[in-house]
Amino acid sequence: MNEKATAAYTIVNDLGLHARAATKLVQLASKYPCDVQLSHQGQSANAKSVMGVLLLCGSKGTVVEVTANGAQADECVKAIGELIASRFGEPS
C-alpha cells in the first residue's frame, strides 16, 4: 500500500537543526522504508541526508513540513514530529 503523510512542525530546541540534531533526524528517518522530505520556505531536502537537512537552515522557531510517501509514511512523520517536539533529546 502506498501511503502519504504530511505534517508541519516547529523547531523548538535553542540550537535549531544543527549537526547533532540533523544526524538524529536522519537516523530516525532512515529506519523507515518510505521516502521522506523536509520543506521550508520553498526549499526541500531528503530527510535521509544530513547535508540536505543542514542546508534547510532550520533555526529555533522555523516551521518545517515533513512529507513521507510509501510504506509506514504516517508512522515516520509522527516519529519525526515526536523527535522535534522532544528538542532532539537536548535539555530545555
Predicted regions and their residues:
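C-terminal structural segments of small proteins and small subunits
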Residues: 59-92
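Intrinsic-disorder/low-complexity, polar/charged segments enriched in Ser/Thr/Lys/Arg/Asp/Glu/Gln
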Residues: 2-8, 63-65
